[in-house]
UniProtKB/Swiss-Prot annotation:
GO biological process: DNA integration; DNA recombination; establishment of integrated proviral latency; symbiont entry into host cell; viral genome integration into host DNA
Family: Belongs to the 'phage' integrase family.
Species of provenance: Escherichia coli
Descriptive protein name: Integrase/recombinase
UniProt xrefs under InterPro entries: CB (IPR044068), DNA_brk_join_enz (IPR011010), Integrase-like_cat_sf (IPR013762), Integrase_catalytic (IPR002104), Integrase_integron-type (IPR011946), Integrase_recombinase_N (IPR010998), Integrase_SAM-like_N (IPR004107), Tyrosine_recombinase_XerCD (IPR050090)
Active site, per annotation: R146, K171, H277, R280, H303, Y312 (o-(3'-phospho-dna)-tyrosine intermediate)
Name of the encoding gene: int
Pfam families for the chain: Phage_int_SAM_4 (PF13495), Phage_integrase (PF00589)
């Protein structure tokens, strides 16, 4: 990602939403971020009667955000995402350098303890997953990586000799090394064999290579056809790249895994609101419970601020951290009334 101080090139697009997409792609933001920002800027423009946003200012932004909070009843995280989209649009697309951009109120996120699964609950969920979905869930729990990071793993990111997995350009565009669970090595090798069959099939059919990071694709346009850059968890069918329009093989869809995981949680009789991201929370809590220091866990999770990691220490204190309830000190009741 480009630094905030780097000069931005002139925009070629004419329509404001196309300008927004152009700037997002230039700065290497993810497709999901692009879709979210376009959604919120479009909603903002429609909210104000399709007026050009260059004619709108602080009061109009505040009115839109108030409507989201008071009428739409959106969550704090959704509210903050909408604000981030507008700040990006005014700052990076319209290049508006006005004080009100930074003075707009930001709602404080609620501090909720993350949902954490016990080892027994993880085993029960895994028992209702099959094939690639089970392996992927094991990988998330065994490494603590985010679901997007796991889906974007390339063949070259797995180092069986050194027992490491490289997560490239994770959140914040930072690379980090994770442990490759020994118990998963055989299954991951089998997964690579299945992936190679898909790769060979694409090669034989003359298919387009897999998508690459923008700068790399421009510099090495044929790299996407090479085996090291192929997906570890490749989709079994081809689809159209929403940005380039090229028909190619994508990685496994996150929605497909999300649905499979949700079914497994229900079938396992887990009443906690568990999602795939819960496996990451459970990984962090398990390491802290095993005695690993907070800085080690921070590095493995890829947190830029240790305060983000500290939330898991609060999870360990649930139940009073060994404090005995005064109710348990009362003598037993002789009879019920």
């Amino acid at each position: 990602m480009k630094t905030a101080t780097a000069p931005l090139p002139p925009l070629r697009s004419v329509k404001v939403l196309d300008q927004l997409r152009e700037r997002i792609r230039y700065l290497h933001y993810s497709l999901r971020t692009e879709q979210a920002y376009v959604h919120w800027v479009r909603a903002f423009i429609r909210f104000h009667g399709v007026r050009h946003p260059a004619t709108l200012g602080s009061s109009e932004v505040e009115a839109f955000l108030s409507w989201l909070a008071n009428e739409r009843k959106v969550s704090v995280s959704t509210h903050r995402q909408a604000l981030a989209a507008l700040l990006f649009f005014y700052g990076k697309v319209l290049c508006t350098d006005l004080p009100w951009l930074q003075e707009i109120g930001r709602p404080r996120p609620s501090r909720r303890l993350p949902v954490v699964l016990t080892p027994d609950e993880v085993v029960r969920i895994l028992g209702f997953l099959e094939g690639e979905h089970r392996l992927f869930a094991q990988l998330l729990y065994g490494t603590g990586m985010r679901i997007s990071e796991g889906l974007q793993l390339r063949v070259k990111d797995l180092d069986f000799d050194h027992g490491t997995i490289i997560v490239r350009e994770g959140k914040g565009s930072k690379d980090r090394a994770l442990m490759l669970p020994e118990s998963l090595a055989p299954s991951l090798r089998e997964q690579l064999s299945r992936a190679r069959a898909w790769w060979l099939k694409d090669q034989a059919e003359g298919r387009s290579g897999v998508a690459l990071p923008d700068a790399l694709e421009r510099k090495y346009p044929r790299a996407g056809h090479s085996w090291p850059w192929f997906w570890v968890f490749a989709q079994h069918t081809h689809s159209t790249d929403p940005r380039s329009g090229v028909v190619r093989r994508h990685h496994m869809y996150d929605q497909t895994f999300q649905r499979a995981f949700k079914r497994a949680v229900e079938q396992a009789g887990i009443t906690k609101p568990a999602t795939p991201h819960t496996l990451r929370h459970s990984f962090a809590t398990a390491l802290l419970r095993s005695g690993y220091d907070i800085r080690t866990v921070q590095d493995l999770l890829g947190h830029s601020d240790v305060s983000t990691t500290m939330i898991y220490t609060h999870v360990l204190k649930v139940g009073g951290a060994g404090v005995r309830s005064p109710l348990d000190a009362l003598p037993p009741l002789t009879s019920e009334r």
